[in-house]
């Protein structure tokens, strides 16, 4: 959202007063809304003109309000420009006809010659590729309306915006959360230095933050204590591990113990915290003693080893108090409603939603999550009732766990309750959630005087249940219609300096047939609908692998993977998607940068990541850490994902699902139509419109209407 190193699709730059960079971004040094260009020096115009010409050729426009001091200019000119200046034709072959014209043996010979020049020489010789002079294409002037803007912002305005996000009950990705916290911490530190922050205000503000991870980090920095026992445990865990999420697995507990052993300050701070708790505070904390007993035992064990007897005494007291004050962990009403059911009217459930919203226990994001669960289960039940899914057919459920991983649960349809009462209950839950979401969005549109949506016709957006449910700025499970274009390309771009030399893009269809470096390069030699661009094993200076989909009526259902064959965990690559309808496509090149409708940087956390699913001529955006395999291969989990798309995808709540209920207050228009409306009515401005086009889309576009 803010860090160019994370996502160039939605860049923001800021400069932290006298500090050039905070997590790789810049801002103007004042809080002025508009900079008086006539008072600026000649040097400013030279620097702006230089950056303008460079960035516009890459599809980016620089906000003139950015202050171009020496260090800011250097950062933009080197780090940022280097990040956006890339050649998407750094492919193995020069154009797609080079692949079609060769049989698999000829392609293999090219592969082997390439491997000999990279792995065979331990990367010490020159790399052989048939495309020894990649075509460099620039952004055409006709595409300037699709430019992405690198904006300027003051640290204060960003911090206020981020604090507003943290005060909403939405889960955030670790990277964006850290960016937000850096901004907020730096601003508050500046205010502290000027004695402008009241301690009581600070404690109240941090305690009211709804994002649990952010609350813990800020409390640690500013030495704030908590009343809630679960918050206390998160704080202790964070002090030892640096991670605010408690994971009581063998690996997680091992990291906790290592933190206590390696960091004497962590032991001292945790020990000091526990020994200074009053009797009443110990009784409150003992209510979660059994839930976190392993953690307390490890603290006691290590403190005993380091002769911290007072800490051991405090933990012994917790153990005694727990016999009286222990509170079993209970599943919340909303967390268990799908299994519990709801046999009353949807209006009664909606009333409870409103009540819990006021107390912070319910939100639009939770309503979306519950709606999706109820709707997906209802889809399965209805498919079974209609005879599409038989009694002994497999029924798959996907559960997301931390770090973008997922767990597949298999059961037979006969094990699923398909009674009329279940159908009624699921419908009641679904309708109540939808009504709540519609009312919430309607209120936002009315309050902000939004009258128009600019919505592309080639994408069907899902509504996100959290900030983690995005790929770049596109919500996960959104569907891009490939039938709108004759030519579709899914590709990955990377450089050695980003941490990996060899990424492998591939696709496996619903019959287990693979397209990729160790399989066929096409799905059909005579009339290929899918073509693989070739295997690049050295990104010096850069590399691209791509899958070209044409003749959309023949596109097979596939899952698209990217595997890290030779590289480091935490390295990155850039996922991009192009669409084009020209007749002479791909002559002398493979990728036209003017056709890129979407791109985002993705961190390679595991060896194998799933980038998307092609189902019924639609590309479904996903970002799932699939496995630790260096090479993609068919498995039962691929079968599960295809079945999930076949039977469950329609259950996801889409943005379009809400528009029928909002047509009386908002109108869907194109960019040109909206510009004409503005010309005809001087009271209509950009503030009366929400633009869902790819080039302007940010996570905030969705989050703002839902938070």
Language model regions located:
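Intrinsic-disorder/low-complexity signal
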Residues: 1-252, 258, 262-264, 273-274, ...
């Amino acid at each position: 959202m803010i860090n160019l190193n994370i996502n160039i699709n939605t860049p923001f730059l800021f400069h932290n007063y006298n500090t050039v960079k905070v997590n790789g971004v810049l801002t103007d040094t004042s809080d002025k809304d508009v900079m008086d260009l006539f008072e600026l020096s000649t040097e400013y115009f030279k620097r702006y003109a230089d950056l303008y010409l460079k960035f516009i050729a890459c599809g980016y426009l620089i906000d003139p309000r950015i202050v171009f001091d020496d260090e800011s200019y250097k950062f933009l000119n080197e780090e940022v420009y280097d990040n956006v200046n890339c050649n998407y034709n750094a492919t193995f072959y020069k154009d797609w006809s080079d692949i079609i014209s060769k049989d698999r043996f000829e392609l293999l010979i090219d592969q082997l010659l390439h491997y000999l020049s990279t792995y065979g020489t331990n990367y010490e010789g020159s790399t052989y590729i048939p495309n020894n002079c990649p075509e460099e294409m620039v952004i055409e002037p006709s595409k300037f309306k699709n430019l992405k803007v690198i904006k300027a912002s003051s640290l204060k305005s960003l911090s206020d915006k981020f604090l507003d996000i943290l005060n909403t009950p939405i889960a955030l990705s670790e990277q964006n959360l850290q960016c937000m916290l850096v901004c907020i911490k730096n601003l508050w530190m500046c205010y502290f230095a000027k004695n402008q922050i009241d301690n009581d205000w600070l404690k109240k503000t941090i305690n009211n933050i709804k994002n649990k991870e952010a609350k813990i980090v800020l409390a640690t920095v500013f030495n704030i204590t908590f009343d809630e026992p679960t918050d206390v445990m998160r704080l202790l865990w964070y002090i030892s591990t640096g991670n605010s999420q408690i994971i009581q697995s063998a690996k997680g507990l091992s990291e906790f113990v290592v933190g206590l052993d390696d960091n004497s300050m962590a032991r001292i701070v945790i020990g000091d915290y526990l020994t200074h708790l009053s009797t009443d505070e110990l009784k409150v904390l003992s209510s979660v003693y059994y839930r976190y007993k392993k953690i307390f035992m490890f603290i006691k064990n290590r403190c005993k080893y380091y002769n911290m007897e007072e800490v051991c005494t405090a933990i012994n007291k917790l153990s005694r108090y727990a016999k009286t004050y222990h509170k079993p962990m209970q599943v919340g009403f909303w967390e268990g409603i799908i299994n519990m059911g709801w046999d009353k009217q949807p209006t009664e459930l909606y009333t409870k939603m409103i009540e819990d919203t006021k107390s912070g226990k319910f939100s639009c994001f939770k309503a979306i999550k519950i709606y999706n669960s109820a709707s997906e289960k209802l889809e399965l039940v209805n498919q079974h009732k209609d005879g599409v899914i038989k009694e002994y057919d497999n029924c798959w459920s996907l559960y997301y766990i931390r770090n973008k991983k997922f767990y597949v649960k298999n059961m037979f349809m006969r094990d699923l309750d398909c009674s009329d009462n279940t159908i009624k209950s699921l419908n009641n839950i679904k309708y109540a959630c939808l009504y709540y979401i519609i009312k919430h969005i309607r209120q936002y549109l009315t309050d902000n005087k939004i009258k128009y949506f600019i919505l592309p016709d080639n994408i069907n957006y899902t509504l996100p249940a959290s900030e983690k449910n995005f790929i770049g700025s596109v919500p996960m499970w959104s569907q891009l219609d490939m039938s709108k274009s004759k030519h579709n390309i899914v590709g990955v771009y990377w450089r050695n300096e980003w941490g990996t030399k060899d990424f492998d893009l591939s696709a496996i269809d619903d019959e287990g047939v693979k397209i990729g470096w160790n399989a066929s390069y096409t799905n059909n030699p005579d009339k290929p609908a899918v073509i693989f661009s070739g295997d690049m094993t050295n990104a010096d200076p850069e590399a691209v692998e791509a899958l070209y989909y044409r003749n959309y009526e023949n596109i097979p259902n596939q899952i698209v993977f990217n595997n890290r064959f030779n590289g480091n965990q935490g390295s990155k690559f850039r996922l991009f998607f192009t669409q084009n309808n020209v007749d002479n496509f791909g002559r002398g090149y493979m990728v036209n940068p003017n056709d890129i409708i979407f791109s985002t940087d993705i961190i390679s956390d595991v060896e194998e990541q799933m980038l998307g699913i092609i189902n019924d001529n639609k590309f479904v955006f996903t970002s799932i850490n699939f496995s630790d395999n260096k090479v993609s291969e068919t498995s039962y989990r691929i079968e599960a994902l295809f079945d999930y798309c076949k039977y469950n995808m329609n259950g996801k709540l889409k943005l379009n699902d809400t528009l029928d209920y909002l047509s009386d207050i908002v109108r869907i228009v194109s960019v040109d139509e909206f510009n004409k409306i503005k010309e005809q009515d001087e009271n209509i401005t950009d503030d009366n419109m929400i633009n869902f086009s790819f080039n302007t889309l940010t996570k905030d576009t969705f989050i703002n209407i839902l938070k």
